[in-house]
Amino acid sequence: MKNASKGCYRTFKHNGYFAHISSFTDYFRHSLDLTTNRGAFYSLLGIPERRIFTRVHNSAPVVYLNGSSVDNSLIADDCVIEGKVENSILFRGVKIGRGSVVKNSILFGGTTVGRDCDLNCVVTDKSVTISDFCRLSGHESLPFYVSKMRRV
């Protein structure tokens, strides 16, 4: 803090959840922490007095079809789930095909996962298509990343 004396700083006390994110791996780990750490989730999103302002999209609610299963996941509206989702974050408009398993993954908006796929520790950017019978696997310390608008 060699320039601390030259500036004017404002601070405030924060007693809630905090995560230092300085890398892609940190982002992945701390984001998924919201699916398993109830204290972190409620500290950030569970306080009624702390409103979250966002754009309204008037999207359909999530559709859970026969054979679907969801555990410890955050799922945005307009998603269609036919497979199994565990400890994952699905953004708006994600589609999970029949028989597919998505674990410990973050799928950004518009991602489509085909039938009988297996995804573990995967991060997809927007509008990614994952073909039927595809297996993608990363690790907690090095998640598998699929860039925007790619087809795998």
Model-derived segments and spans:
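Left-handed beta-helix
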Residues: M1-V152
